[in-house]
Amino acid sequence: MSQNGAPGMQEESLQGSWVELHFSNNGNGGSVPASVSIYNGDMEKILLDAQHESGRSSSKSSHCDSPPRSQTPQDTNRASETDTHSIGEKNSSQSEEDDIERRKEVESILKKNSDWIWDWSSRPENIPPKEFLFKHPKRTATLSMRNTSVMKKGGIFSAEFLKVFLPSLLLSHLLAIGLGIYIGRRLTTSTSTF
């Protein structure tokens, strides 16, 4: 809550999270907020209470479907220290019911977190079905002159290679020349008839 120039006057309602500070002259020429002093321990209590109230209201109004953040042992130690610290500094307006309710909330959050972590860690892995596993086909022996016994023995200029290669070369050339002559005659006769 904000305080006006007089320390005893307090505003009853805060608009959002804004706090209005009024400055007073302390005699040294500098201005210091009236609500801030070294001996003012009430401010710390007010801030702690506001933090606890805001935590409770935000956790109740949250409708998010995602699981809450998992707490580490350090977080649980901090939560228990905060609870014991806040018990010692309770105002008369807070009752034992609020304290019990807060402890139940913390325990339920811890239980939910551990259940969620256990469910997540024990789920089956996403392995595709066996029919979708792609396998490379086995490589068949390619037809190549390099892998023949003729090439392994003597190379290109061996007698065995030349006996096979030269007749096939001559035959393919004769076929190509014959096909070329045939197509050429067909084209010349078709153009002369028009």
Swiss-Prot record:
Q: Which domain of life is it from?
A: Eukaryota
Extract one GO molecular function annotation from the record.
GTPase binding
> Which InterPro entries does the entry mention?
BNIP3
BH3, short sequence motif: residues:
100-125
Question: Residues of the signal sequence?
Answer: none
Sum up the protein's function in the record's words: Apoptosis-inducing protein that can overcome BCL2 suppression. May play a role in repartitioning calcium between the two major intracellular calcium stores in association with BCL2. Involved in mitochondrial quality control via its interaction with SPATA18/MIEAP: in response to mitochondrial damage, participates in mitochondrial protein catabolic process (also named MALM) leading to the degradation of damaged proteins inside mitochondria.
Name the family the entry cites: Belongs to the NIP3 family.
This chain belongs to which protein, by name? BCL2/adenovirus E1B 19 kDa protein-interacting protein 3
The gene it comes from is: BNIP3
